[in-house]
């Protein structure tokens, strides 16, 4: 990954790094699966693999994190080398990164986290909440990719 350092010393990914991860030079398609259970999630991943895609995001759209974690464990066990990112619905990295680090310690590797809200305030000079999230990520040691949304739906109005 490029040596370019961003806020809080986090390395900034360059386009070439992203393409290297997915072993392609063009657009990368990463479907999102709204998880219901292990079996349907596995069937959806099988369709994704059959289509030649390299990964997916899983989201717990209608249930909490505690019920989602066993699904993640089962899916990672079934697809140990498939690229998997997750979204814990409405959860920032502040809470998610320690959970992901714990999963990693137990052998459940999650490749990326997508947060709907990265807690960036475009009207502020300092980004205390985003910096706290970055510090939490560093402190817990989770090394996956982080996709953090800004001005995402259902958040505060943007000027």
What are these regions (language model features)?
Residues 1-3, 159:
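Short intrinsically disordered, low-complexity coil segments enriched in acidic
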Residues 3-78, 82-83:
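Conserved N-terminal beta1-alpha1 strand-loop-helix module at the mouth
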Residues 27-41, 86-95, 150-158:
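Active-site mouth loops of central-metabolism enzymes
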Residues 30, 54-55, 66-78, 87, ...:
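Flavin-dependent oxidoreductase catalytic cores
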Residues 56-60, 84-85, 112-114, 140-142:
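Short, surface-exposed, polar/charged, turn-prone segments marking secondary-structure boundaries
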Residues 62-63, 91, 119:
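Conserved beta-strand edge residues that scaffold enzyme active sites
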Residues 68-90, 130-146:
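Alpha-helix-loop-beta-strand connector modules within alpha/beta enzyme cores
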Residues 95-158:
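Conserved anion-binding
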